[in-house]
From Swiss-Prot:
Site (described: Transition state stabilizer): H186
Gene name of this polypeptide: Pgam2
Cellular component, GO, one term: cytosol
Protein name: Phosphoglycerate mutase 2
Function: Interconversion of 3- and 2-phosphoglycerate with 2,3-bisphosphoglycerate as the primer of the reaction. Can also catalyze the reaction of EC 5.4.2.4 (synthase), but with a reduced activity.
Amino acid sequence: MTTHRLVMVRHGESLWNQENRFCGWFDAELSEKGAEEAKRGATAIKDAKIEFDICYTSVLKRAIRTLWTILDVTDQMWVPVVRTWRLNERHYGGLTGLNKAETAAKHGEEQVKIWRRSFDTPPPPMDEKHNYYTSISKDRRYAGLKPEELPTCESLKDTIARALPFWNEEIAPKIKAGQRVLIAAHGNSLRGIVKHLEGMSDQAIMELNLPTGIPIVYELDQNLKPTKPMRFLGDEETVRKAMEAVAAQGKAK
């Protein structure tokens, strides 16, 4: 018997997504398309008449603004919001700011494929000479982190390792207590939660790429195990395309 509902949404397209650049912890703004995606997702939540008691997001504006849009459109702007670096996107280290073509030219296509598709191989670290080192590592939003907590690069495994404790210690107890939760975050931090909920293998989660801006609904039992497959919210065409895109990701290219 279903006892809980969880809604998650990956932020709308950012300006750096649009330019095909590795974004990671760089605080990119939503693109026009991304802002529209957030509005569409918000409207889908409104149409489904879903209410929230508490929301969680990262400390990066593309996720925060997506959340704001949802709360605005659904007239729930008063709902408490918790922001945490633990829900940030994967830190792409030395690749941050490069587009895929530049990265392939610099490091070789095979190496880039390993960084993108390997579960536990991190990209090269972001050193102090990197263009974005100061704007990320020295930003005051991270002033409270211990030196060992502040990454210079992350694999997907690393990203999940810092996101999951927050899920286990903060979010899961709220859901079990009956709170209706919305998480607006990033492709890789949300992958960590999906992997945990569904007990997916390392390989399977690497092949799952969550669509931007489309709310994902989970019905969970009292042990927070899904009672049904993840469900997308939106008009029929949007949902069909999202489901096809997710299904196709498991197939050989």
